[in-house]
Amino acid sequence: MSGMCLLIDAGNSRIKWALADTARHFVTSGAFEHASDAPDWSTLPAPRGAWISNVAGDAAAARIDALIEARWPALPRTVVRASAAQCGVTNGYAEPARLGSDRWAGLIGAHAAFADEHLLIATFGTATTLEALRADGHFAGGLIAPGWALMMRSLGMHTAQLPTVSIDAATNLLDELAENDAHAPFAIDTPHALSAGCLQAQAGLIERAWRDLEKAWQAPVRLVLSGGAADAIVRALTVPHTRHDTLVLTGLALIAHSA
């Protein structure tokens, strides 16, 4: 058995994983779908344990357990949950355990990656989440909104005449809209208008939160972006930002190596 740690981030859309060495470097990593895919762990050395963040429910937990058991029977497993304090981060939630494990691990990863900086962490998945993290590691609170895809899908499902637009289709529509400078960012047909409107709603939320946080804290705040829809939302942002797409796995590595 190696000193490596298997890290698993089970979100609502995909399951991401990494194998981290004793220096918390990712030796290898990947992602797979919940039902239709599986990771190839056949050549990986046996880790000393698995650290799991799961916000996708019981079915995802059972599948992860089955995958681990098939490759490394009886491997020790730790299901990560938010706590009052861990790895230099303190939890400002009134009930700390109710904070999602992915958000908690992401906060720990962000605090380590950008030490001594005030942060606003925006993660774009099924939901869009924002976390306000002070330079001293105190999580001051957050916001949760529908993600870009969920926002577009909700309009298609709950209105009589609006279409349901996927992320891939919306991205192509926005490319077309950007080529027509005479109208951008305003669209002259419904699919373009829906795609651009939901994208601008995401960007507007982020920019408003960032400006409000800098005003409240009277100090610079680094805006950190993460998540699958970040590529699209970046195109609508007009404020400085930094990308970091492994915050949760980085946080899980820190939690694992502090155990």
UniProtKB/Swiss-Prot annotation:
Signal peptide: none
Pfam family, one: Pan_kinase
Catalytic activity: (R)-pantothenate + ATP = (R)-4'-phosphopantothenate + ADP + H(+)
Co-factor binding comment: A monovalent cation. Ammonium or potassium.
A GO biological-process term: coenzyme A biosynthetic process
Binding locations of substrate: Y93, G100, S101, D102, R103, T190
Biological or metabolic pathway of the protein: Cofactor biosynthesis; coenzyme A biosynthesis; CoA from (R)-pantothenate: step 1/5
HAMAP family on file: Pantothen_kinase_3
Protein name: Type III pantothenate kinase
Species, as recorded: Burkholderia pseudomallei (strain K96243)
Lineage: Bacteria, Pseudomonadati, Pseudomonadota, Betaproteobacteria, Burkholderiales
